[in-house]
Regions:
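Extracellular/periplasmic periplasmic-binding protein-like sensory domains
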Residues: 247-321, 390-395
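Extracellular/periplasmic Venus flytrap/periplasmic-binding protein
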Residues: 92-95, 140-142, 149-254, 291-298
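Short, low-complexity disordered leader/linker segments with a strong preference
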Residues: 1-39, 70, 395-397
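Extracytoplasmic "Venus flytrap"
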Residues: 31-60, 84-91, 113-114, 180-188, ...
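Beta-alpha junction/loop-to-helix N-cap segments that form part of ligand/metal-binding clefts
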Residues: 25-33, 52-56, 71-142, 212-219, ...
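Signal peptide-proximal N-terminal region
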Residues: 33, 38, 59-81, 199-203
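Periplasmic-binding protein-like
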Residues: 100-113, 132-136, 176-181, 230-240, ...
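Segments of small-molecule ligand-sensing domains
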Residues: 306-317, 328-385
Length: 397
């Protein structure tokens, strides 16, 4: 009898030990570091073809987190932001997510990069581990319609950027609009939103699309087709390098039709590659111009110079800065431990979060995308300048 009792006790202790080891070995909602540190994580393409985005985005967010830590952190807690290189690969990103959650025990994924890459982690991070993913630099409408537990974003969707452009060209008086877009489905999906938005503003506007093979470098035949259409305005749904190729060829062929673009067009790389051909181009952006003279932008430029020397204070670094600042503004409202659960509650209760550099954000239990607003920018004297304030595009059908 004593032996059976002893064996039963040993088995019970072993089971308890297994539970303890299991709990210690995973991240999950209760992972919170200690009361002096807030441990969060992210992945970026720091190598490979997309490193030109990943490196500056990381630098912008890191500059803000460093500046907050220099001022004492979030309510006395230091931010420990763990960043790993995913080379823009979804499979690598899943493995990175497991390390961040299980080994580093982060309480959230914050200001990370990539739509497909982040989405690949959702089954493990959001659904299994219950770790929130906050302020991703990327996103898709399906992420937020309906709202998903633990997933909150702050970047206006490409489709809403297109709606803003349709409204803008119509208000500028264009009656015949040509949308030049790369041929993959992702670009077409955005281009298709311009016509309906333009016609909501002015039913007489006619919109036609001109697809271009992705990564085309010779835009001479494209410009010839544009000239033949004789549009009042051209909207570019192209990557920055291709937009620059379009602009240079348009200038070479004497095409002076007003040109508009979505946020990927409004990049420093477009100006660098296109030179004088970019003068006068209009676009929408997710943040204010980094050349603006208001205090929040000045703070950004000063912090970049102090903490991330060698990295430009441009739109891409400002995206990262805005994502980091929004997180801090919301996290500092938490009274008590900063955990996955408390962060999720804080986001659901966050209203009128103003970073000073991006649209004011508001969330709720049913609204996990904080804004639809964009900023108009125009190239003047070789640099992007803000025009007016952030505005909300027409509601899409």
């Amino acid at each position: 009898m004593r032996r059976r009792t002893t064996r039963a006790l040993i088995a019970a202790l072993a089971a308890m030990l297994a539970l303890v080891v299991s709990a210690c070995g995973s991240g999950g909602p209760s992972a919170a570091g200690d009361d002096r540190t807030i441990r969060i994580g992210a992945w970026y393409p720091l190598t490979g073809a997309l490193a030109s985005f990943g490196i500056p985005e990381r630098a912008g967010a890191d500059a803000y987190f460093k500046s907050v830590n220099a001022r004492g952190g979030i309510n006395g807690r230091t931010i420990d932001w763990i960043v790993k290189d995913n080379a823009y690969d979804p499979q690598q990103t899943v493995q990175i997510a497991r390390r961040l959650v299980d080994q580093d025990r982060v309480v959230a994924i914050v200001a990370t990069n990539g739509t497909a890459q982040s989405q690949a982690t959702f089954p493990f991070v959001l659904e299994q581990s219950k770790v929130p993913v906050l302020n991703t630099l990327g996103g898709d409408a399906s992420w937020y319609q309906p709202a998903r537990d633990g997933l909150f974003g702050l970047q206006t969707l490409y489709e809403d950027q297109a709606a803003a452009l349709g409204d803008w060209v119509a208000r500028d008086g264009a009656k015949k609009v040509l949308v030049v877009h790369s041929d993959p489905a992702a670009f077409l999906k955005v281009a298709e939103e311009i016509g309906p938005a333009a016609r909501k503003t002015d039913p007489s506007v006619r919109v036609k699309r001109l697809p271009v093979k992705f990564q085309t470098t010779d835009y001479s035949p494209v410009i010839s087709k544009v000239k033949a259409e004789k549009p009042d305005a051209v909207v570019l749904i192209l990557a920055s390098a291709e937009a620059a190729s379009y602009l240079k060829e348009a200038r070479l062929q004497g095409l002076s039709t007003p040109m508009y673009g979505y946020a990927p067009v409004a990049a420093q790389s477009t100006l660098t590659l296109a030179g004088k051909a970019a003068e006068g181009v209009r676009a929408v952006q997710l943040v204010k111009s980094p050349h603006d003279d208001d205090p929040a932008i000045k703070e950004f430029r000063a912090a970049m110079a102090k903490y991330e020397r060698g990295q430009p204070a441009d739109f891409i670094t400002l995206w990262g800065w805005a994502a980091a600042k929004a997180f801090v503004e919301i996290a500092k409202t938490i009274d008590g431990p900063v955990t996955a659960e408390s962060l999720t509650r804080a986001y659901e209760n966050a209203r009128h979060v103003d970073t000073g550099v991006a649209p004011v954000l508001s969330f709720s239990a049913g609204r996990h995308l904080g804004t639809r607003d964009v900023q108009k920018v125009v190239v003047r004297n070789g640099r992007w300048e803000s025009r007016g304030d952030f505005f909300t595009p027409p509601v899409r059908d």
